[in-house]
A protein has these predicted regions:
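Terminal peptide-recognition signature
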Residues: 165, 187, 194-197, 226, ...
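Conserved PDZ fold ligand-binding element
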Residues: 187-210, 214, 322, 329-333
Length: 383
């Protein structure tokens, strides 16, 4: 705004000045108008509101507040570098986007929530507020939480790489090292930490997928003979299998596989922890290593853990991730089948959800969506 200031020209003769000589200059010594009661109330109300907001902003509250976090296109770049880098195999461009989704939150060790955060969380339809003890153990530190999340992220990247390469037909050799046994199973006391599984019932175990395939043919209670390398010597150990949670047979050991990757994959991402991006990492790698433009210009978001067999697992914060996806332009969302009960009734306008249980499901959904032939894709339903 431009303000023009006009200088007053003094009269040539004092008599030409119409003001009495003893007249006061405007505003000099004149009485100040008394504020009205309404003005006093309004001023007091504004002051009280400001004080209240200030108090709420610094008053700790025993809650954790989670809302939609940032999304990242796994086919895109981070600081000028591809989010997924591949060496040892050709990669192909894609015109679509595959967005991993996250949640952001305050509350818990190292990041306390304040009353204002909690109030905003209660008001926002896309946020959730829970007692902090329902989210974090009482005796855990922020450093321990961050370390755990970082480890889970690294594990999810390795699982995603193996699952994607196997999906594309690569062989991924693995050394199957026993990390421990399940208490109460027959393997407890028979197998030792550091044992390397090399065969089962005389069939070599060159990779993790072979072990999973062999166990699929075994019923709980069957006896299997495991050939292990222990202290540089080969031994046969007979183990009675037990029932695995979710069905099927298990040996009763924890396996820490060491993979010999046929392709070098590097995932460049910081500031995000946990395992829930695994499915989108795997799907992005599949698309990059496939000549076809499978996403074909569509923005697809999603979430889900993944294991080396390609099984998609449930995650937390699905509703917040749905909100973050539609906020960042996604038209489709790939949701773990085990999260479907939380999805129903909470899908934002403009977003279509596809239920996936495996990496194969996710890949087929991506291809169908990119081809414009997605009408028959399964969606989440109640029950």
């Amino acid at each position: 705004m431009i303000v023009l200031v006009l200088d007053q020209i003094p009269p040539d003769d004092p008599a030409d000045d119409p003001r009495p000589r003893d007249a006061e200059e405007p505003g000099e010594g004149s009485p100040v108008p008394r504020p009205t009661p309404r003005a006093v109330v309004q001023s007091f109300g504004m002051l009280a509101a400001s004080v209240l907001v200030g108090v709420l902003a610094v008053m700790p509250a025993p809650y954790a507040v989670n809302g939609p976090g940032p999304t990242r296109d796994v086919l895109g770049e981070v600081d000028g570098e591809p989010l997924i880098e591949v060496e040892g195999a050709p990669t192909y461009p894609s015109t679509g986007e595959l967005r991993l989704t996250t949640i952001s939150g305050v509350g818990g060790p190292g990041y306390p929530a304040y009353a204002l955060n909690v109030l905003r969380g209660w008001i926002s339809p896309s946020s959730v507020v829970r007692p902090v003890e329902d989210v974090y153990p009482q005796d855990v530190s922020r450093e321990e939480i961050d370390e755990s999340n970082a480890g889970l992220m690294v594990s999810s990247q390795e699982n995603a790489t193996v699952a994607a390469l196997v999906e594309l037909g690569y062989e991924v050799p693995a050394t199957l090292v026993v990390a421990g046994t399940v208490e109460g199973t027959d393997a407890d006391g028979k197998l030792e930490e550091g044992d390397v599984l090399t065969a089962m019932d005389g069939v070599a175990l060159p990779d993790y997928q072979t072990l999973v395939g062999r166990l699929a043919d075994v019923a709980p209670g069957d006896t299997v003979t495991l050939t292990v390398t222990r202290h540089a010597r080969s031994e046969d150990v007979s183990v009675v299998t037990s029932e695995r949670e979710g069905g099927g047979a298990q040996i009763g050991v924890f396996i820490d596989p060491s993979f010999d990757m046929p392709v070098d994959v590097r995932i460049n991402i910081e500031g995000i922890g946990g395992p829930s991006a695994g499915t989108m990492f795997a799907l992005g790698l599949v698309d990059l290593l496939t000549p076809e433009d499978e996403a074909a210009g569509v923005v697809i978001a999603g979430t889900g853990t993944i294991d080396v067999t390609g099984a998609v697992g449930p995650i937390g914060g699905i509703r917040q991730k749905l909100a973050g996806a539609v906020r960042d332009g996604a038209a489709w969302f790939l949701a773990p089948a085990d999260n479907c009960d939380e999805v129903v009734g909470h899908v934002p306008d403009g977003l279509r959800v596809v239920e996936v249980a495996t990496l194969r499901d996710a890949r087929e959904a991506m291809v169908a969506i990119g081809a414009g032939d997605a009408d028959d894709l399964p969606t989440c339903t109640a029950g």
